[in-house]
């Protein structure tokens, strides 16, 4: 049967089915049972909380080791800032002409680039601006590929859930997670906090740190309906020039892999905090209010009367909340000097990048041929057992953290934490007691690049 005939047949069957079902549907009786919360118990080897930049990679890696792996994500998709937050521009994977972060994170980025028909920057050339070596990805594709890789690795994904209690009992963690109509008690041998806010670390009773003043978040959007080249900028206040220029550039088709602009527009959201549902709600409302006011103001400008929003992310991307107090705290001096520790498991390359209430950015760049590294001890909270973190909440001072928080670095941490957790199970010891050489060897087997 030809495809055309088959489609016609299916269409006719569908139409008949709908028509046949109408009379009974009109006379159907609605029997609605009272709402009941489904309670259950589950066991897993490695439980990862947070399906963002680091958690997604940690879950894929944990699953690929053969460990039973569960991933809790409070949202509807994986990827975190790369997808939901809209920073679809991960980096930095290369430094001084060489690749310094590879493994599963790089694999995922490459797959997203290839499937979207995009091109990579020329990493052999050292750019004048660090962000020119970041990689543009299609966020929708990235989210789908991340989910596919998790499922292929056997990961159980639990969307729309958040933990409500965390207890250590007889060498295992008991995590109560609640979601839409479900409450599950999960027993796990290893627990990895990838929330970005050190939420699980705090719930477990370990110390966390926070600055009195935190960096602003960003609500990412795009707009159209105007021609930047035709605008008379002399009639438009300077404070609007960046937003107008940025979105004009974004609409242009890139013909090479070279980044000539950051591929999104954004507004700063001071005090953005994703730690609780209440603070997260405030951050998102504030971001949308700021953007709405910007659009109203722009439409009053000459040549901008038809400006319109073409897309807006559903969440404000957050830069800074809580950090753990780990067995080792990475300092700014460690970072900018490119210090390598005996237990360094992954690299990090990005300038110290402290955003100050949207008014200025303090940056400090690494000197030629220096690359920072991340020791295992910075991923382990003090006095913890069978517990790791990955992502921006690692143990670090504020200035070091402003560089360590970026996506490629978080991906490397996620993979390192997952491999460490799997070895902990195999060896029957807590992560802090594992020989770093054993973790390094296993990471290399999975394609990661180890600091030396």
Residue ranges and their predicted role:
Residues 2, 8-28:
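N-terminal export signals
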Residues 29-43:
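A short, basic/flexible loop-to-alpha-helix module at the beginning of a structural domain
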Residues 40-52:
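Beta1/beta-strand and adjacent pyrophosphate-binding region of the FAD-binding site
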Residues 55:
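N-terminal Rossmann-fold NAD(P) dinucleotide-binding loop
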Residues 61, 67-68, 74-165:
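Conserved N-terminal/central alpha/beta ligand/cofactor-binding core
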Residues 81-82, 143, 160, 179, ...:
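Flavin (FAD/FMN)-binding glycine-rich loop and adjacent Rossmann-like elements that form
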Residues 167-184:
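Conserved beta-strand-loop-beta-strand element in the redox core of flavoprotein oxidoreductases
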